[in-house]
């Protein structure tokens, strides 16, 4: 089974994906590293620009029929049996990205993406089996246990559990000002 862990930068994808792979006894695959290994994409600054279709081809070729956990904000665009969309309060995302040294514009862009469900909508356009998990205020272990409970109970689709419009006023400073 290919499980894709996706979400806006700053939601905790890598930590959760590594722990989930460990608990399931699956191979952990960082899509950025995988693309670089395969010689696809181009590094521009801190970002890797890659053709999604080309990456998807290599993912399917390499992992079809195997048990892997894919980690990356493009993983929901890859062939997968189950997509887990991690969500986090936009303010939390802004704070984490600020700590990572993201520019104000990049912080605003990612806060906005989380606010309007960009990754979730893209995942639903590509896949039937999509589970949304709110990571806000939870430890990575709690998130992994929630995912495992959902998988073990046979749930393949759970969406619509996050609505950031209720906190929109609180998020406005983070949209284009990076929290300042």
Curated annotation (Swiss-Prot):
GO MF assignments: adenylate kinase activity; ATP binding; ATP hydrolysis activity
Chemical reaction(s) catalysed: AMP + ATP = 2 ADP; ATP + H2O = ADP + phosphate + H(+)
Region annotation LID: where it falls in the sequence: 99-109
GO biological process terms, semicolon-separated: ribosomal small subunit biogenesis; rRNA processing
Residue segments, region NMP: 30-50
PANTHER family reported in the protein's UniProt record: ADENYLATE KINASE ISOENZYME 6 (PTHR12595:SF0), POS9-ACTIVATING FACTOR FAP7-RELATED (PTHR12595)
General function of this protein: Broad-specificity nucleoside monophosphate (NMP) kinase that catalyzes the reversible transfer of the terminal phosphate group between nucleoside triphosphates and monophosphates. Also has ATPase activity. Involved in the late maturation steps of the 30S ribosomal particles, specifically 16S rRNA maturation. While NMP activity is not required for ribosome maturation, ATPase activity is. Associates transiently with small ribosomal subunit protein uS11. ATP hydrolysis breaks the interaction with uS11.
Similarity comment: family membership: Belongs to the adenylate kinase family. AK6 subfamily.
HAMAP family associated with the record: Adenylate_kinase_AK6
Protein name (database record): Putative adenylate kinase
Organism encoding this protein: Pyrococcus furiosus (strain ATCC 43587 / DSM 3638 / JCM 8422 / Vc1)
């Amino acid at each position: 089974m290919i499980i894709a862990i996706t979400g806006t930068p700053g939601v905790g994808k890598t930590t959760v994906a590594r722990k989930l792979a460990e608990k399931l006894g699956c191979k952990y695959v960082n899509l950025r590293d995988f693309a670089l290994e395969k010689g696809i994409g181009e590094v521009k600054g801190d970002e890797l620009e890659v053709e999604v279709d080309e990456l998807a081809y290599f993912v399917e070729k390499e992992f079809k029929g195997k048990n892997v956990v894919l980690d990356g904000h493009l993983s929901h665009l890859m062939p997968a049996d189950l997509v887990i969309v991690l969500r986090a309060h936009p303010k939390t995302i802004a704070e984490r990205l600020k700590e990572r040294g993201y520019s104000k514009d990049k912080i605003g862009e990612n806060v906005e993406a989380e606010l309007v469900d960009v990754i979730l909508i893209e995942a639903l356009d590509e896949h039937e089996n999509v589970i949304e998990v709110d990571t806000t205020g939870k430890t990575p272990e709690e998130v992994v246990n929630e995912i495992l409970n959902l998988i073990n109970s046979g749930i393949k689709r759970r969406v619509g559990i996050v609505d950031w419009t209720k906190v929109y006023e609180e998020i406005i400073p983070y949209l284009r000002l990076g929290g300042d």
